[in-house]
Amino acid sequence: MANTALADTRSELEAGARALGLPLEGVQLDRLLAYQVLLAKWNRVYNLTAIRDAGDMLTHHLLDSLAAVPRIAELVRRVQPEASRVLDVGSGGGLPGIPLAIACPDIGVTMVDIVQKKTAFLTQCRAELGLTNAQSHWGHVEKLADAVGYGVITSRAFAELNDFVRLAGHLLAPGGRMVAMKGVRPDAEIARLPEGWAVESIERLTVPGLPAERHLVILAPSA
């Protein structure tokens, strides 16, 4: 990015994050912008996202992911106050996992994807951005095992809700929540949820600069 464009993008990012209740420090803003540059660079070769315009990346990727961060952070810190852990399923180019890891350095973020080139990108992001609280895993989430479990398991563009809970639900810590990021309210998907799962809440998100519907669907095991 040219210096003027970079300054404008930084100002827009800072204002957007503040509107979302995320007063980020300078180093966090720098890391988010560096992540966007990495995403655009790798995208030219590996096709990580269909969005290529820098302005659209800011709203559709960075701010869209950051909009979910306050709620995800609140939930996981409540469930795991000592060592908060979030699993991002089908993370792709690191959304929402990388923005979450940058905004919340106290939260451990694991990102899983079945496409090796995407997890290679996530590994590169961890190294270049110095994200010691983030890690990536290449493979199928249903084959993962974890003795502790994750306080929050999230996904942004992974699958329908029934597949989300079926494939990843075994990794949830006691008292944990599954948080799906969706566009329009997914009533049809909710109706297809399998037995043993219940919708705790459906929360509408407002993303600065993005005039589109966004919802968080928060799921919990039912008694």
Swiss-Prot record:
It comes from the Bacteria. It is found in: Cytoplasm. Pfam families: GidB. S-adenosyl-L-methionine binds at G90, L95, V141, E142, R156. GO terms for cellular component: cytosol. Keywords: Cytoplasm, Methyltransferase, rRNA processing, S-adenosyl-L-methionine, Transferase. Its EC number is 2.1.1.170. One of its GO terms (molecular function) is rRNA (guanine-N7-)-methyltransferase activity. It catalyses: guanosine(527) in 16S rRNA + S-adenosyl-L-methionine = N(7)-methylguanosine(527) in 16S rRNA + S-adenosyl-L-homocysteine. Belongs to the methyltransferase superfamily. RNA methyltransferase RsmG family. Specifically methylates the N7 position of guanine in position 527 of 16S rRNA. This is Ribosomal RNA small subunit methyltransferase G. It comes from Ralstonia nicotianae (strain ATCC BAA-1114 / GMI1000) (Ralstonia solanacearum). The gene is rsmG.
